[in-house]
Amino acid sequence: CIGASICQQGVRDSQSVLQRAVQAVREANIPDGALPKVCISGCTSSCSGHQAAAIGFQGTVKAVPGGKPAPAFAIFLGGSDALGHAHFGDTIGTVYEEQLPALLVELGQAAAAAGQNWQTWSAADPDAVNSIIAKYV
């Protein structure tokens, strides 16, 4: 997904969010494997394949209590594009765009603290995954 800065279909600038997320994860020293491949689409067109990602994000808006709608991303969790095992993940909430990098950092830190990669940790402790995500939705 090339994002809303170029694509006329885009609702959110997925490339900008990706750059901020990568920077935050690197600055937090999240080890390789603590997070899966993350797919970010700026709209519902799914150019990144966010529905079939272990963690995917789809550009949208989210109401701010007592205010105007703010840039946000719907969160998809648990999808797979593996041959013979492909399936869509579940939509589990919406995170404000500005909080998306922090969400990924916290998920990566939790998997790393458990001494496991994302796949092992998220399968072994889905309640921890959901608890972290609940703070952001």
Put a short name on every predicted segment.
Residues C1-V137:
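Peripheral terminal and linker regions in Fe-S/redox and tRNA-modifying enzymes
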